[in-house]
Amino acid sequence: MAAAALAPAAAQSAKGIDLENTLYLDVEYGRVVIEMRPDLAPNHVTRIKELVREGFYDGIVFHRVIDGFMAQTGDPTGTGSGGSGKNLDAEFSSEKHVRGVVSMARAQSPNSADSQFFIVFDDAPWLDRQYTMWGRVIEGMEHIDAIKKGAGQGGAVSDPDAIVQIRVAADVKE
């Protein structure tokens, strides 16, 4: 009985973070901690965790980075046109796209999100209710700010920074 009572606490860190719904995204500049929001986008969070646990994102570049707007990654081709091959239906919410929010990138169709995601550098209200928000940066936003920016409105980055690795916090033994 005592072990069962302790089980939920095992999934919480000393800081009260839900480790099963927290990502450690490591870049050259340091660790970024992302709190995932299964309450907003349960299917997206499930898929992101599947991809993370497969090592899908490790080594993938931030191919599109627009200063003052966002940093986009998650395309294994590094071109902005690739993905994992599995589209997800939109899970739009009323949450606001503010600094540090993590959302899925998509094509024209609302149901075309796959593996690409972006982190906003600043508030972006024009994205609200248009993109599936599945998390937010809770530590290390300065490392996202340090990512090399692209040129022009398209934000294509020559010699882009890459994700070193992403891990679900519950899977990391520290």
Where are these regions (language model features)?
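Cyclophilin-like peptidyl-prolyl cis-trans isomerases
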Residues: 2-174
